[in-house]
Amino acid sequence: MRGVKLLAACLYLAAAATVVVHAEDPYFHHVWNVTYGTASPLGVPQQVILINGQFPGPNINSTSNNNVIINVFNNLDEPFLLTWNGIQHRKNCWQDGTPGTMCPIMPGTNYTYHFQPKDQIGSYFYYPTTGMHRAAGGYGGLRVNSRLLIPVPYADPEDDYTVLIGDWYTKSHTQLKKFLDGGRTIGRPDGIVINGKSGKGDGSDAPLFTLKPGKTYRVRICNVGVKTSINFRIQNHKMKLVEMEGSHVLQNDYDSLDVHVGQCFGTIVTANQEPKDYYMVASSRFLKTVITTTGLLRYEGGKGPASSQLPAGPVGWAWSLNQFRSFRWNLTASAARPNPQGSYHYGKINITRTIKLVNTQGKVDGKLRFALNGVSHTEPETPLKLAEYFGISDKVFKYDTITDDPTPEQIKNIKIEPNVLNITHRTFVEVVFENHEKSVQSWHLDGYSFFSVAVEPGTWTPEKRKNYNLLDAVSRHTVQVYPKCWAAILLTFDNCGMWNVRSENTERRYLGQQLYASVLSPEKSLRDEYNMPETSLQCGLVKNTPKPVNPYAGA
C-alpha cells in the first residue's frame, strides 16, 4: 500500500512538473561570435562583419511568444549593438539594441539579449545600429511563425526562404563613417546584393534556392540595405503577397514588389513553370542610373539555363505609390492571436494628438546634417533610457525640444541635440511624415506597429483626413514617403519605454534624422514596463551607479 501511495505521489509530482514546463513559453539559446572577415559581395574581396563566420548572419527561426536568448560576443575593434527590426519588445525596451536604450557591447566583451516576439508573427530582420556597421553586414533574417493552434490563411509551404536584398558599397564602413564625420555624403552605392552576393548573370552562379516542381514556397523579402529602395521580381513567376511586417494582407499577385529600406514582405511563390533555372532580379529604384543584380533559382531535376532576358523593373514613383495603395489588411485572418485582425477598429478611435515630422537637410558649422523639425539628433554618452531610469534626465537631455507643428523658421534653423518626445501613455496619436525633399524617405518606429492610413503628394492639412483608409490599412512598422509627399500613420502608444523613430536611410540616421519617443507609465507598474535587467550594461554618467531598487512595482 505504501508503495502505491509513493507511486501516486511521484506521478502527481511528475504531472505538476509537466504543467510547469508547458506553462512557460519555450526558450531558444544562441551564441553568436561577431568578427571581421573577408567576402566578395560585388566580386572584389573586402572586409565584412560576420556572425559565427556567416555573411549574412544566421537566420532566427522562432514562433510567437518564444523566448529568444542570444549571447553576443563582440570580437570587433569597436563598440557594437544589434537591433531586432520590427520586434516590439513589449514592456522591454531594454533589449531593443539602439544607442538610446542600451550601452554598447565593448570590444572583447559580451552581452546576452533576451526578448520575446510577444503576440507577433511575420517577417523581420536584425542589423547593427552602431556607427556605419550596417554597411559592412552583421545583418540576418528573423522569422516569427504562427503557433500551431492559430489558423494561417494559406497552405503550409514546402519550404521557407529568406531573401535579404540591399545596396552595397565597396568602401569600408570606417571609410563611409569618415565621409559622414567630415560632413560629406557617402554618395550612390556600388551595387546591389541578394543574400550577400551579386550574381554574374551568365548562368555560372550557384543557385541560392532549389524548388520542387508543383510545390509552393514561402519567400520572405527584406530590404536590409543602407539607403536605396529596391524592386524585386522573379522571372516568369508571380508572387502572392500574404504578409507584411507582421500583418496578414489581402492576397494579391504581383509581378514585382518595391521594397523600401527596412521593409519586409512575405510572399508565396509556386513552382509552376518549365523545370529549369530562373533569375531573381533586384534593381535600384529612384536612382539616375539603375543598378541590377540577380540570384539563381533552380528547379529540382530541371534542365536548361535561365533566360538572359531579365524582366524589366518599373519606372517612377507614381507606380510605387499605386502599389502601396493596393496593400490591404486581411480583416478576417488571425495574426498571433485567435481573434481576427479586423476586430480592432482603429478608424473609430478619436485622435488625441497630432505630430508632424518634417525631414530636412542642411549644414551646421559647414558639415552636412539631417534633421526632424529643425533638430538633428545626437547620441549622448549616457543612453537616454538609462538617464530616465536613474533619474538624471535633466543632466542628459530635454524633452520636447521640437514642436508638434513646426514653423518654416524652426525647420530651417538646424540645431544638434538629443531629440526626445514625451508621449502620454495609451494616447491615440496621429503622426504625419512630411517630405519636402527630392528623395524617397523610409521611416521606422521601434516598439510598435502602426496603421499607414495615407501616402499622398503635396503638403498635409487636417482636411486630408477625409482621404485616410480607416478600414483596412496595413498594420506595419516602416512606411515610405515619396518626394514632395506626406504619409500619415495612426497608433496607440500603449507600450512603455524609450522607442526610436528613425530614418532607415543609414546615412540620414547617422547624421541626425531620428528621435526617441518616451512613453512612461504614470503608475510606474510592472504591468506596464519591466525593471532594468540585472545583466544590463551601464555606461556614461551611470557607469558605476547602483541600479535603482525596483522603481517599477505593483501589479
From Swiss-Prot:
Q: Which Pfam families match?
A: Cu-oxidase, Cu-oxidase_2, Cu-oxidase_3
**Any signal peptide, and if so, which residues?**
1-23
Q: SUPFAM superfamilies annotated for this entry?
A: Cupredoxins (SSF49503)
Tissues showing expression: Maximal expression in early binucleate microspores; declines considerably in mature trinucleate pollen.
Q: Where in the cell is it found?
A: Secreted
Q: List the disulfide bonds.
A: 103-539
Question: What positions does the domain Plastocyanin-like occupy?
Answer: 25-145, 158-301, 345-524
Spell out where the chain is glycosylated: 33, 61, 110, 330, 350, 422
GO cellular component terms given for this protein = extracellular region
- GO terms, molecular function: copper ion binding; oxidoreductase activity
Task performed by this protein: Probable oxidase that may be involved in pollen tube growth.
Name by which UniProt lists this protein: L-ascorbate oxidase homolog
